């Protein structure tokens, strides 16, 4: 047999009788014929048998299909030796027959073989009839799509207009922010200059009087020292020398009258008050309550754990490690390890109190100095403000009724304010905080009104007082 005949026979043996193309995943029926798995599946489209072989029409009760792997290899060899030729337009790719009809169910072009095989139960129409019908449907779809396109273009124009408007609004607000903060900077700079000028005027007004008093005292000290030295020397003289001109010496002693300096008020009239500062700090407000397990037995806490005052007698409470004793202190429940925090405390007319923060690990059982070295950063009021690290400074004309405490953990900043008028009371030197900090409260004296943690609401600075 010639080589071309062998090649032709290989093509014929590797070709499916249904699709007339090389086998794809060939399977064998009970009668021994081979077909592509997908071709025979579509040919046997009905769910129940009997099933007829497309070649010999032999009936089979079940779909017994066995994979034919050798035939699959043969089909692959034939496909490599003789690749399928391109299918001309208008010709069925499966059967190489002219496309003459259109399947309305699968929306596909059919040749006569397709129509008689897997599409024999479908709605099949001539090409021109199907084309005319689909053309009408396409024209309706085009009309709908054109309307959709008009709407899309309108929406696009509106979206672009909205984007431009949004950018304009953002830019306007940006300019408002820049302008407002520039105004605030000018206002703060002017306020700073006014306060510094007032301080300088106070300094120039009071300091000469203080220096005059100090100079006068210096002169008196010099005169007293000279007189003392003279009398000490006279006491060492013999009787004649001691008594000689003694009248003059005694007269000068009797004439000595120490003139104390004039009393100069040590109250600064100028206070550091930044406009709007308290309102800004209230943005960092926290909801702080008292921890009863840390309260000294002499302290009485309210039911809502927001108020504390000295009791009339010591309570019988467990001596747990967290409790302050003997110090009259109580801590807040909140544990601070980062961030900015602000709270306000109503102290009313109490004559002495202490507020601030302390380390979680600070000693609460020994009576010692509540200093930063021991883990305490507190402001104490005893008629004047002071803390354990700084010398006492002069009393205010009007001690605050409400105290604001601001803590910036990362910045190492702790400051105290009069929450009533926003004036600065005290700022601790910059501190490197570490570990957990807790708010500290201490009513140092008995008072009919308690020390109360205020409820702060709203960002604008609106507050609810002690509840």
Curated annotation (Swiss-Prot):
The keyword Phosphoprotein applies. Transmembrane segments: none annotated. Residues 267-460 form the B30.2/SPRY domain. A zinc finger (B box-type) spans 87-127. Residues 304-313 have a biased composition (Basic and acidic residues). GO terms for molecular function: protein domain specific binding; protein-macromolecule adaptor activity; transcription factor binding; ubiquitin protein ligase activity; ubiquitin-protein transferase activity; zinc ion binding. Pathway: Protein modification; protein ubiquitination. Zn(2+) binds at residues 92, 95, 114, 119. SMART domains: BBOX, PRY, RING, SPRY. Residues 304-324 are annotated as: Disordered. Pfam families: PRY, SPRY, zf-B_box, zf-C3HC4_4. Gene3D superfamilies: 2.60.120.920, Classic Zinc Finger, Zinc/RING finger domain, C3HC4 (zinc finger). It catalyses: S-ubiquitinyl-[E2 ubiquitin-conjugating enzyme]-L-cysteine + [acceptor protein]-L-lysine = [E2 ubiquitin-conjugating enzyme]-L-cysteine + N(6)-ubiquitinyl-[acceptor protein]-L-lysine. Its main location: cytoplasm. Autoubiquitinated upon DNA stimulation; autoubiquitination promotes interaction with SQSTM1/p62 and recruitment of AIM2 to autophagosomes. A zinc finger (RING-type) spans 16-57. Keywords: Antiviral defense, Coiled coil, Cytoplasm, Metal-binding, Nucleus, Phosphoprotein, Transferase, Ubl conjugation, Ubl conjugation pathway, Zinc, Zinc-finger. It comes from the Eukaryota. One of its GO terms (cellular component) is cytosol. PROSITE patterns: B302_SPRY, ZF_BBOX, ZF_RING_1, ZF_RING_2. It is an enzyme of class 2 (transferase). Its EC number is 2.3.2.27. Belongs to the TRIM/RBCC family. Binds cytoplasmic tail of integrin alpha-1. Interacts with the HN peptide. Interacts with PHOX2B. Interacts (when autoubiquitinated) with SQSTM1/p62; promoting AIM2 recruitment to autophagosomes. Interacts with AIM2; promoting its autophagy-dependent degradation. This is E3 ubiquitin-protein ligase TRIM11. It comes from Mus musculus.
